Amino acid sequence: MPPKPAPGDNEGNASGSTPTPPPPPPARTAEEARLRLAEMEREREQEQLLEEMNSNTPAEDARNISRLTQLAALLRREQTNVHVTNMALEIGRPALQPPPNMRGDPTNMYSQVSSDFLWKIKPQRISNNMATSEDMVKIQVALEGLGVPTESVKEVIIRLVLNCANTSSSVYQDPKGVIEWDGGAIIADDVVGVITKHSTLRKVCRLYAAVAWNYMHLQQTPPSDWSAMGFHPNVKYAAFDFFDYVENGAAIRPSGGIVPKPTRAEYVAYNTYKMLALNKANNNDTFGNFDSAITGGRQGPAIHNNLNNANNKTL
């Protein structure tokens, strides 16, 4: 049997692997050692350069593309044309959780009331000076009983309110004419009679004051008697006797809101005429009894107001 080849022998490397080169002999001088070190550094730099050039493998490219795609998606999510400023949200915030000793006791009348408790109570716009929802339902059913179609009841009431804006909403007025709708008509006296049975004409007119206000401006038709009532042309749209309820929160508002908003001059003109009208109508209120022994068969004296104390000084 032939002997085995010694390690490092050429015959033992028949597999084709490259034999490991023998280590260089030790440097004899310091200068030779520095030269060898510099050569080793150059070889290391060349190997790193080759590795960097060959690093863009398909797997590395796929990772880079995935990272770029994720970055682009992130930038798109952060991109927006809306920027909210002055952020302050009170509605929808998480409810506070006070400790047990500070929680409200609903059985104790003197328990402190929190802001969250008050927020749960939704406001209701209520006025005792205009017709209530129950009054309006009674009026609707009564008008239906007279033959007014259900879908025309609102139109009949609004038409009557618009007529009252031109005349008066007083219970003592004598309504004239008819109230028409598509396919029928009803005498105005019957409508007023039904309203006064369940409420008052003025309360119903106050309920629709904002509707009448918008209608007059939309059609550019102020109340007919504005000039006879002494109103200036600049405030002529305020010349109806339920103008003071246009901005009342309990009144029925048009879907587009109140347009235009009543001015301060219109309120001054209206309240001035209201004072004069009430003084003229209440002259008999000075009598404690209407017996002829007291009144002497005469109307009461005119009521006069001293307006000399009004602040008419210029600033």
UniProtKB/Swiss-Prot annotation:
Key words, A-Z: Capsid protein, Helical capsid protein, Ribonucleoprotein, Virion
Localization per record: Virion
UniProt region (Disordered), positions on chain: 1-60
InterPro entries from the UniProt entry: Carlavirus_coat_N (IPR013569), Pltvir_coat (IPR000052)
Cellular component GO terms, alphabetical: helical viral capsid; ribonucleoprotein complex
GO molecular function, one term: structural molecule activity
UniProt keyword Ribonucleoprotein, yes or no: yes
Biased composition (Basic and acidic residues): 29-47
Keyword field contains Ribonucleoprotein: yes
Biological role stated in the UniProt entry: Required for genome encapsidation. Forms ribonucleoprotein complexes along with TGB1 helicase and viral RNA.
Family: Belongs to the potexviruses coat protein family.
Designated name of the protein: Capsid protein
